[in-house]
Amino acid sequence: MDDNEYRHLTLENGLKVMLISNATADRAAASLDVNIGSLQDPVSRPGLAHFLEHMLFLGTKTYPEAGEYQKFIGQHGGSHNAFTAGEHTNYFFEIDPEQLNPALDRFSRFFHEPLFTEEYVQREKEAVNSEYRSKYKDDFRRSQYAMKAVMNPKHPASHFATGSLETLSDTGSEKVRDQLLEFYDKYYSANLMTLAVYGPQTLDELEKWIKPLFTPIKNQGTPLPSYNAPMFAKGQLPLDMKLKPVKDLLRLNLVFPVSEALSKYKQKPTHYLGHLLGHEGEGSLLNWLKNKGWAESLSAGLGNNNREGSLFQISIALTKDGLENVDAITEQAFSYIQLIKEKGVDEWIFDELQQIDALHFRFQEGRSPVSLVQQLTMNMHVYETDDLLIGDYLWKGYDPELIRHYLNALTPNNMLRIVSNQAFETDKHDPWFAAPYSVSTIDQSQVDTWSAAKSTEGINIPQQNPFIPEDVSLQSASTQSIPQRIYQEDGLSIYHQQDMSFKGPQSSVYISLRSPLAQQGPTNQLLLDAWVELLNDKLNPFSYPAQLAGQGFSLYTHMRGIGIRLYGYRDKQDVLLAKIIDEMKAYEPGQDKWDQIRQELKRAYQNSLLKKPYERSMAELTRTMLKPSYSEQDLLAALETVQLEDLLALQKQFWNKLDAVILGHGNISKAQLSSTGKLVESKLLAETEYQAVARKAVTILSSGEQAQAVEAKHKDSAMTLYIQGGGSELTERARMGLLGQMLHAPYYTYMRTERQYGYVVFATPYPILEQADRKSVV
């Protein structure tokens, strides 16, 4: 239930504002969104919008000290950030509510009195360049820029957006500071901005604060710019691209330019198509591809979505066999599109999606204040005022012709196909991230074959969802501050915490199955990983409709065994759990599935070694501090010799000795949780011997400094400094938490802004289990 009060207003300068008041809020937040981003960069200054975002944090007339804003936010338990997208630049912070007004004072001055100090203009170029370099080997970023390389060069979506020393350097009479000022004066106009503020103060008080602070923002009357060109020029498609990634990724992307969809937020035609094409249940495209052994996962929906055009994408993670059959997979995708044309445009599907999202909106769980204000500022540029809160969930006005309009754009003649594989031979590189690729036109005979694709036996439009909750009643309104143990026998402990804080029908149930096998070497660790992945794959067609209806689960490995988490609406959770348990006990994968999961795990372990340097150093830190822990190299070595028979043996052994712990939280009574416990006990623990499983041990460091090198295959480098606390007591952990909060802002300002040592810079508490620690990264 939403306890917030809202007020929408427009200031004298045209700035649209949403105020949110919640008397019980223990955090305050604000966001300002400019409906301008990197798509508005001057052709001669790629990255200027992003560079401007950086510069606004480096001093204003009233607060000229660089880092003063960051320091103030950090001193009062807050956080801040910003991002630049194609058509948005969004600034946001959260803070202790008592400091909201002075924080707004500092924040507001970004937008009417920034300094753009010459010294920091030069320094911040280095920070932008470091950000660019940090993503140089990021495969997602590389795939984006390979696609940009074949887009219409007249559309700004084809341009470089991050910025670098090269693009931001002064050239002759063109000074980047002058262009910053020109861009700021033109586009940072109140009529292109939206503001949202959240706090425990009354709406009248919030309005009284924001009017004098944000009214000084000038309204230049700047119109939203037009692009005057499509993302792909007429006759440019179809194209076939081969892309060589850094990591061992096998992927097929089918990309279709479609007309803009932002204004169609009520009818949601692209969401409708994404729901059908991205479905994972029985009879779905993904289910068919998995049964062939060709795909691991699939998603569908809008990618690049701007106010004059969009890209609809079908993205498929392939197996090795799938890579050998990309033409057949492509044909099957068009076969499914044909099936949608024949049977899939139906009002009952629209009504079901409407019903599900209405439930999600009605019972949405508490969002963080900063997430709420960010979303509202972006919605305010697109949605009608009455729809600002519900627009993301709104389905209104079933329009089959509108759905068919977008469906008719999903054709072989209107497609960019991208296949990713490390083994490809390529002959081109994109100019900014050096992504190796080659591109060719698609033969007309192949286009004709795909265009004639017919619907295939075994593939169907999804059936009606049986998991839509019927009982959304609430338990009594009592709330327990801490979990209470309601059952204790050797082998099973049950803890219950009824929490009605959010007044919703959702609950979470955590089931920890602790086995001594989990800590008996890397072979057992990878076998548990494999078992869980195979189970998730097996359960997916059954559980996917439940997930859509708001009843999800996750099955995962942890330090002492396997965990099951059920979350969402309480209704029908035990139906889902019973299916999970039955499959855990009965499922024995065949050789084909085993071979496939070995390939997946091998790629996953190898790709972990290619993560960014700071990610690698943090992972190595955790592995070093927790014993027993196994490196990717350990797991890869074990993977070379392990066989299907080893997995089947481990599955049987797993049930011999267990210690199970259950925690129920939220809208769940003791009686309901006890029923869940009996289900677990009868199906999983009836023939199991109890054995307690110890926690992993935290390494206690000796005094002095210890250095450890970590190999990283990347242009950048990283340093992680870890300082171990004096113990695990709550007071020591609180001290480390406070120290991290105090150090974050000055550390960031000195290491990044002043000294330019790196882009990813932070100091933070880093508890390992209950051990109090602090960590800094650069």
Cite the ranges covered by each PLM segment:
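Extended, domain-scale alpha-helical bundle/helix-rich regions
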Residues: 405-416, 422-425
